[in-house]
């Protein structure tokens, strides 16, 4: 109900705020970085960015190649409707929640490998649920025998309760 102050009608806060949408499950995207590499802040940011977009780009690539299991995300790319392997409902809720990302840390490639092993033991698949990011070593890092360096693992956006058994014990990257 509008209140009157000095002859001017005003609306109460309850009248002007839209009703909050019901809260969906917490959805986050996790990226786990190997901090033992001593990357600069800019290099870490670039590697996390690669990991963050990998889920959408990998799914989009599968759609372009004709994989019918990818769900629509409503983006046009190359004249086609882009699709991703991320569940459309999860993706929509993640976007609604502000696309939250959490960056965690491990120390060393063995720790990254252990993380991948935990993920696979829970049924997660590389190239669909998580992405191993390797740097081309053109700027800061020294390549390993493969000619690149494994820097991080990025997970597709997912319900926190699904990913917590894999990442829950890891510290935040600082």
Regions found by a protein language model. Give the residues of each.
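Positively charged, small/polar-rich N-terminal and surface patches that mediate targeting and assembly
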Residues: 1-174
């Amino acid at each position: 109900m509008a209140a009157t102050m000095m002859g001017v009608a005003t609306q109460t806060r309850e009248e002007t705020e839209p009703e909050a949408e019901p809260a969906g499950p917490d959805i986050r995207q996790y990226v786990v970085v190997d901090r033992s590499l001593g990357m600069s802040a800019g290099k870490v940011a670039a590697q996390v960015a690669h990991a963050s977009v990998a889920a959408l780009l990998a799914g989009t690539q599968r759609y372009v190649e004709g994989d019918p299991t990818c769900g629509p995300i409503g983006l046009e790319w190359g004249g086609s409707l882009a699709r991703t392997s991320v569940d459309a409902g999860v993706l929509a809720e993640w976007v609604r929640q502000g696309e939250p990302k959490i960056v965690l840390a491990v120390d060393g490639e063995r720790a990254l490998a252990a993380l991948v092993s935990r993920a696979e033991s829970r049924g997660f698949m590389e190239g669909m649920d998580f992405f191993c990011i390797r740097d081309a070593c053109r700027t800061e890092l020294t390549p390993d025998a493969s000619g690149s360096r494994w820097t991080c693992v990025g997970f597709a956006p997912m319900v926190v309760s699904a990913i917590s058994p894999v990442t829950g014990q890891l510290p935040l990257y600082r």
